[in-house]
Amino acid sequence: MNITQILSQELSATAAQITAAVELLDDGATVPFIARYRKEATGGLDDTQLRRLAERLQYLRELEERKAVVLKSIEEQGKLSDDLRAQIEAADNKTALEDLYLPYKPKRRTKAQIAREHGLQPLADVLLAEQSQDVEAAAQGYLNENVPDAKAALDGARAILMEQFAEDAELIGTLRDKLWNEAEIHAQVVGGKETEGEKFSDYFDHREPIRAMPSHRALAVLRGRNEGVLNIALKYQPDDTPITQQSEYEQIIARRFKVSDGHKWLRDTVRLTWRAKIFLSLELEALNRLKEAADTDAITVFARNLKDLLLAAPAGRLTTLGLDPGYRNGVKCAVVDDTGKLLDTVIVYLHQENNMLATLSRLIKQHGVKLIAIGNGTASRETDKIAGELVREMSKMGLHKIVVSEAGASIYSASELAAREFPDLDVSLRGAVSIARRLQDPLAELVKIDPKSIGVGQYQHDVNQSQLAKSLDAVVEDCVNAVGVDVNTASAPLLARISGLNQTLAQNIVAYRDENGAFDSRKKLLKVPRLGEKTFEQAAGFLRINGGKEPLDASAVHPEAYPVVAKMLAQQGISAAELIGNRERVKQIKASDFTDERFGLPTILDILSELEKPGRDPRGEFQTASFAEGIHEISDLQVGMILEGVVSNVANFGAFVDIGVHQDGLVHISALSNKFVQDPREVVKAGDVVKVKVLEVDAARKRIALTMRLDDEPGGAKHKMPSENRSRERTAGRKPQRNDRAPANSAMADAFAKLKR
């Protein structure tokens, strides 16, 4: 199959859809642009499908390039048969291709090559083909100045056969698949590391099938190995198997080369090939495969959580007081207006409560503050308590206080971007500005921070960093373009994420705006230096201009489709202002009346949807959690308490919930609902406000077990996974050990815990 056919099969799309999408991508179109404005061409492929297509397209093209290199190399050696060419051209992955290339791949002189140079290839061939003869006698005919005795001859012949066995592509493929499907990974504590590595205690003697090991356990075990606490190995047969007993893998090798059961020398050669050569290579390969799969899974989790946070509902354009709590260095305070512009800053101290109340009260009255955003770090609860007093005392002001995640705020405050924005503002106060702004509009503020610093990733520092960065960049790009931005108020970092734009163009837009005033039309963007027609095509639909000359500029209708809207207006006999936002009028328009060769039904329906509700925001309604009074630390928790919290992170095994005690609790997947849950994201997402019951508290190990099944009783049956969940574990091939899995809601191992960074 060619690349188009492969992608068509993998994405369940037609060849025409794939061809169109590939042509658009090759022409420089972005995924958001294609997904939104080229639905006719791609048959409606969404951004997720297009991202997958782009990723696989790159892989398959690299595979084709590698095939060409391999074919050329083997052909130059004069060893390229028609059968081998066909096998190489049929290889559908890089591993299979490299297996085929291995016997022909230039390599440093091996023992086998030296043996061939000494004339021992015929001996190896004879020993394998004529197994009835005596090996010692056969070796006598191959002695020379480089091969002084029979032992040297047989050692050379063995090296040749071992290399021959180990480079058989079909055999290696069979052994690889068998090992992956049947072997267990075994983790054991390194002697003397029990105390130092206590956080990995769940893995001090842990076994489970490698193919079924979930990403969080795989990454925990691999981290334990990297920190020198755990030894890990692959086990392919019971530990008590006699060392002389032939394994199933050795039997497969023997059958492949027709080695008879009674030929000890050849049997020993097979055993050595497997144990000293093939297994060691496949074990390393399997562990790498486990790591890659775990990385992919963890990155997917991170990306989903990031998307949920970026698309969290904004509190809106209200003057906001941001509080960055602290004890010794005080509570840093910053007031921003409804556009996010900094108005005032001050530092107050918790131990000077009266002064703090008076100062904050003055700020609130002076600037007409409507929202108080409180960072959720150190001293958050004490700061929240004082903010609560202000809300009560100033009830006529219509104040609201909200605790928000401050993850990444300190990194932003020390960044070059923050320094450019606030060159004269103390670094410590910049974080308070970020906290205030992220309440007003999470997306606009969080794009300024490295996604890895937002604190919603599972083992984000353990996974492939380039793959992680690529995935997260795609998420940010998709989120920003899904919402769209106001070109007259957006920051350069936000504009840089728009389809077709980059940092340079974003800065040029801001500079042009600062010098010439607000843009009054999308067309004016073409006056920005280096912003040409192609870039305009990619970006214009995602850039909004409110209150401009053209009402459609405030919508997601692309300028290329304005003539279509003009036809609609002419048919209805009304102006754009009369149609936009007028649901009844829009409903009177028949979409099929306006389709043509360029604009099909999907685009016309999108236009009508946008006209009905222009500039619609895909983000939900703003909501907040109310943390319980008097619950500030983990020591304040009692089993049985029912609390309100915010989902901070969703993993494959459950959801972490911030209940205001500086340590997130875990709702295991089995405690998310009374119904069977396949994926935690079916029930919750990052940012959701939920009610939970405390099931277990281990203050020493900082573990909090929670449940969303509020009728669960601590110590009762809920500490066992529901039978349906156990069934799922079995069907997935998992074999969790008792020392690996604590009761279903015991907050899991520290190694599973989200690291808030």
Swiss-Prot record:
Residues 710-757 are annotated as: Disordered. Keywords: RNA-binding. This is Uncharacterized protein NMA0194. Residues 710-741 have a biased composition (Basic and acidic residues). PROSITE patterns: S1 (PS50126). Gene3D superfamilies: Nucleic acid-binding proteins (2.40.50.140), RuvA domain 2-like (1.10.10.650), Tex N-terminal region-like (1.10.3500.10), Tex RuvX-like domain-like (1.10.150.310), YqgF/RNase H-like domain (3.30.420.140). It comes from Neisseria meningitidis serogroup A / serotype 4A (strain DSM 15465 / Z2491). It comes from the Bacteria. Residues 640-709 form the S1 motif domain. It holds the Pfam family Tex_central_region. GO terms for molecular function: mRNA binding; structural constituent of ribosome. GO terms for biological process: nucleobase-containing compound metabolic process; translation. SUPFAM superfamilies: Nucleic acid-binding proteins, Ribonuclease H-like, RuvA domain 2-like, Tex N-terminal region-like. One of its GO terms (cellular component) is cytosol.
